[in-house]
């Protein structure tokens, strides 16, 4: 059985966010680096560092938390894996879904690389819907 690195990233970030952890350590691959760059650019995470340990590279993500008067921290990150190895979901540029009216983002794997739904609509290309983030 294969390893689903995108689901591992999503699960690690979601668990750290629910447990109010400040940092997450994930394996560094080309796909994970592309997804993390999108998360950083869209403001869902604060910082990314690349760490080397025993000839293996890891990404250390610093999560963004919002303070609330009633609670000490409020989680602001919701992630959902859409396309998975057993069931691939594809969409053309006209049918890419909008998450919460454009507040959330859809991460797509296209022929021109991994990008957000807005970038794919501007370039008028479709692809595999990897995950929703809001």
Curated annotation (Swiss-Prot):
It is found in: Plastid, Chloroplast. The keyword rRNA-binding applies. One of its GO terms (molecular function) is structural constituent of ribosome. Its main location: plastid. One of the primary rRNA binding proteins, it binds directly to 16S rRNA central domain where it helps coordinate assembly of the platform of the 30S subunit. Part of the 30S ribosomal subunit. This is Small ribosomal subunit protein uS8c.
């Amino acid at each position: 059985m294969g390893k689903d690195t995108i689901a591992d990233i999503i699960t690690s970030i979601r668990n750290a966010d629910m447990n109010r952890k400040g940092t997450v350590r994930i394996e560094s691959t080309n796909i994970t680096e592309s997804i993390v760059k999108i998360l950083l650019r869209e403001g869902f995470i604060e910082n990314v560092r690349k760490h080397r340990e025993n000839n293996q590279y890891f990404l250390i993500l610093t999560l963004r938390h919002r303070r609330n008067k009633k609670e000490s921290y409020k989680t602001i990150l919701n992630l959902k894996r859409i396309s998975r190895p057993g069931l691939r979901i594809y969409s053309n540029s006209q049918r890419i879904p909008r998450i919460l009216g454009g507040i959330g983002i859809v991460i797509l794997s296209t022929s021109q690389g991994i990008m957000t739904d807005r970038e794919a609509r501007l370039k008028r290309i479709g692809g595999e819907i990897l995950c929703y983030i809001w």
